[in-house]
Amino acid sequence: MSISTFSECITGAARSASDLVYKLIYSKRNRLIFAFVLTFVTLTLMTLTDRYGGGSDDDWAISLALSGRLPDSGLCLFVNAAISQITLALNTAFPAQNWFLVIEFIITATAFFSIIYGSLTYMKPLFGFLLIGAVEAFVLPGCTYESNFTFVAGIASLAGFLLLVGSTKTNSHSVIIPVAGIIFCVLGFLWRAEVLLLSIPFFAVALGFIFLSRQNRKSSISTSFSLFSVVQASIPYIAVIVLCGCFYAYNQAAWQEPEWAAWKDFNSPRSELSDYPMPDYEKVANDLTNHGLSKDDYFAPLMWITADTEVYTTETMEYLSSLSSALTFDNYLANVSEYLSNVSKSMPSHIILVVAFAVITILASRKKTALPQILVSLGFALVICLYFAAIGRLPERVETFIWLYSLSAIFLSIKHNAYDNDPNGTRKKLTEPYKTREVLASTTGLLTWVVATLLVLILTVPKFNPALLSAYLNQDTFRPNDPATEYASRDDGKILVWGTASYFDVEHAYRLKFLPSEDFLSKNLFLGGWTDRAPYTMANRERANMTNVIRGLAENPDAYLIIEEHREGHLPNLVLSLIQEHYYPNATIEKVESFKGKGPKDTFSVWKVRI
């Protein structure tokens, strides 16, 4: 095959691909069908999959908190009180489903559908397909088989602002689009308010450039940058602020109840101990001694051991958190350096690669006209990422949305009128020859989406398991297959107290999706964690006569400590030391049983404290 023939084949393929793209984007019906089919296929593959788990078990813990399978449930620290109460009511009325995950699935599906439709409507095809592909590859896994509520809040917020800014950009007369945008923004706020707030500067940038563009090209009253147009365009955003404010006030009122306020007051310093660096023991030893705290008392909360209600009071936790090290300039530099190193190591699969590709394609297709948007929006993203990296608070789920918000703001701010606003122009566009640059741009966008979709298919199709559908419809039919879960389910009268890291095996046995029975939960307790001192946790402990878990390990004849030796082999001696220091100086601890876990290196051991 000659070079000229090969070139003709490539050109022909590109024009054919471009024809498909324009037939899709110039038809509202086709965009809706495409959005529905892509949403249905990807969400089905990512939900009915043997892949599960990610970097966090928070969704599983939230699901438990709102399951109705623990006494005195009601609120959860991470989501708005309104969501907590609705989820709890649904779980109580229809316990066969895990309603927290059901609601997350509905939000994810509708938000992704809206992102597809909105991207192809309010952005040029190159940018629209690029954003859809990025969401498929970097966001949907976190919303589905990895199951993290931060990703769900992020995809809802992204969909909301995309619809709102898109309708503002095109002066859309549709009522459905802005209403849907308002709903998604509010859902993002309810699921995790910080994620919605993080998007505001980027979409403010998009709106700013959109209004500046109108001002620069005004030629009549209808296109002028008038006060009336600003007020009219502001109505949906004001609605978002008002609704979020109402839900914020409702949440604040719900947390005024004494038992819930006490949990929140305790968890605040507890989380600081987990999230911020602490000084070496030697530097604070004298202060700790003056407060009646030992070396073990100091280190235990750093390992999520706080279930001693007599030692670790709210006042004690506040004192310990006050010792947290103030970050020095050297710490900031070290954290930023570590962040940059991690980005370089994970570059083939890092969101920053999409950002770089997007910038290159924008500059190639728009020359310098989009440079201000790029500099401002990416500048915001870089500053925010470096700030969170410097203080050590930039997990992947946060970084991903910072860059996606930034890209979306750039894509939306670039001049483009919605196809639905000019039917005559659409018909003309479909019949006239395409410019070479348009063909290249639309083909490039389509190819990036195809690559992202192929990646999704490669990851999910081999793990597709339609048999899971029955478990989603009735979670009580799910039977975990794991030695740790089998041991924890035995009806032998034992009350098991788990190390937090050791309990991960049980969580993963349930695929971080399905919930154990009320009986199971009543006889499996923990040494700490963010649910410590929650009213439902304390009520569950009281049922087992283990209000003070550390002391209960010594005093309750049915209580046993269970750990995975590879991860938490140090815990038996630490727990014994805490008991000896505060309650029974002559207490001893012995291993009474052990068994192999599911992993090749996992060995679980069961310990009994004797007094």
Descriptions of predicted regions:
Residues 485-570:
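Short periplasmic/luminal acceptor-recognition loop of GT-C membrane glycosyltransferases, typified by
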Residues 73-98, 102-107:
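Short hydrophobic/aromatic helix or loop-helix immediately within or flanking a transmembrane segment
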Residues 106-125, 357-364:
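Transmembrane-helix motifs of polytopic, lipid-linked glycan transferases
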Residues 139-140, 176-193, 204, 237-246:
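Membrane-interface alpha helices of multi-pass inner-membrane proteins
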Residues 39-76, 88-91:
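Extracytoplasmic loop-helix module adjacent to an early transmembrane segment
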Residues 29, 175-179, 229-240, 418-464:
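Signature aromatic-anchored transmembrane alpha helix within multi-pass, membrane-resident enzymes
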Residues 125-131, 163-186:
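Short hydrophobic alpha-helices at membrane interfaces in multi-pass membrane enzymes
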Residues 253-331, 519-536:
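Membrane-proximal stem/loop segments at transmembrane-domain junctions that anchor or position
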